Amino acid sequence: MDQYREEHDAIGTVQVPASALWGAQTQRSLNNFNISGERMPSALIHALALVKRAAASVNHDLGLLDENIARAIITAADEVLAGEHAGEFPLVVWQTGSGTQTNMNMNEVLANRASEILGGTRGKGRKVHPNDHVNKGQSSNDVFPTAMHIAAVEAIRNRLIPALEALRKTLSSKSAAFSDIVKIGRTHLQDATPLTLGQEFSGYVSQLDHGLAHLESALPHLLELALGGTAVGTGLNTHPEFARRVAAEIARLSGYPFITAANKFEALAAHDALVHAHGVLKTLAAILIKIANDVRWLASGPRCGIGEILIPENEPGSSIMPGKVNPTQSEAVVMLACQVMGNDVAINLGGAMGNFELNTMKPLIIHNFLQSTRLLADGAESFNTHCAAGITANTVRIKQHLQESLMLVTALNPHIGYDKAAEIAKKAHHEMLTLKEAAIRLGYVTAEQFDVWVDPQKMTEV
């Protein structure tokens, strides 16, 4: 059997591996863009297959595509959606900025596979054409941004939101469990007035609640699809009903309420929806850094750090220091969140690079967007399972810090004034006295008054 076969495109003949389902344009891209090896995300490939399936169905319903050809394309697309033929999509991210080569990769694979389904031979005697049939009424310029939005919505809905909700649930349960544990607060990394450990954790829960709400608010723009705009947004060479119908079919297939974009010129030339949505991902990264950093600081020690919470001992922490346990889940979350922030810069630049009727940074934008959603989802899930769920309070250390804190003196402000309270704190600090001892020696309060006025539990009441 020959190792290669000849495939043809508008430029000429190309040698393609005999076993491959792809065709000439995919092979040209492989030959011309051997850059880094980072392939198009599988989520985008899945979304493209969904687009082609929907388009074939709608074009048939509109009387524009033969029933047998439409059925064959739909069957081939269903195979891709089921995870088959994954090796037939080898193109890298760093290619044409419109994603044309990946669109044609999908067109060629589905055309060759559909031809086989109709009894043809792979790459020969083509019964289904990649452009005339699979890409009918479409352009890479409207197909690729449509797939970008589908992939983004599915990544957010299917992976990111559930992972964040699970972490939020765990932190909420910890907040409730720690509601009666009074501890010292910290501002500017210095001792402050008390709060409960539950109140501290409630802040993390509220951050995630707001982050999830921001995610929801970013979805409506992502639910608008460019398909039907074709080359520049005018809808040239497509049926007047195609855009509306294909959006409805994509909504039916995906289970998400996609609609056709009201203005296709914006949908092709700009990616503001993804820039905005990734701004939310950046915010979520900041939220996770805040939570992860607090956890590792609160767990620092065991003898010489803050040590007010205990985290699970998942693995040895050092190759040289025996018995060391490091906050590895927090470190992983901080790293991945920093990567998301870097991705945000790339997406902002990519989103700004729309020239006239087309943005030509599409692969960059969706590659980074999907990496960010995956990192945040995986990171939240890992942190939840291997760290947050196992957090416990070190009540002995918490009580020690509370008793030693000079900031409890704040409770005396309403009774003796700020200046005298500050004098008590300074005397206690410099002479190594307790606050109570310093207050009595200065003659500002009696022992009985101090015990009534300086009550850490009452100081935490909102």
Swiss-Prot record:
Enzyme class: lyase
Residues noted as binding substrate in the record, renumbered to the chain: 98-100, 126, 129-132, 139-141, 187, 319, 324-326
GO molecular function terms noted in the UniProt entry: fumarate hydratase activity
Keywords, comma-separated and alphabetical: Cytoplasm, Lyase, Tricarboxylic acid cycle
List of catalytic residues: H188, S318
Compartments, record wording: Cytoplasm
Keyword Cytoplasm recorded: yes
Entry EC no(s): 4.2.1.2
Site note Important for catalytic activity, residues: E331
Catalytic reaction list: (S)-malate = fumarate + H2O
Region of interest (Disordered), residue spans: 120-141
GO biological process: fumarate metabolic process; malate metabolic process; tricarboxylic acid cycle
Name of one Pfam family that matches: Lyase_1
Pathway in which this enzyme or protein is active: Carbohydrate metabolism; tricarboxylic acid cycle; (S)-malate from fumarate: step 1/1
GO CC, one annotated term: cytoplasm
Free-text function comment from the UniProt entry: Involved in the TCA cycle. Catalyzes the stereospecific interconversion of fumarate to L-malate.
Quaternary organization: Homotetramer.
Note: There are 2 substrate-binding sites: the catalytic A site, and the non-catalytic B site that may play a role in the transfer of substrate or product between the active site and the solvent. Alternatively, the B site may bind allosteric effectors.
UniProt family annotation: Belongs to the class-II fumarase/aspartase family. Fumarase subfamily.
Protein's name according to its UniProt entry: Fumarate hydratase class II
Organism field: Nitrosomonas europaea (strain ATCC 19718 / CIP 103999 / KCTC 2705 / NBRC 14298)
Lineage, highest ranks first: Bacteria, Pseudomonadati, Pseudomonadota, Betaproteobacteria, Nitrosomonadales
Gene expressing this chain: fumC
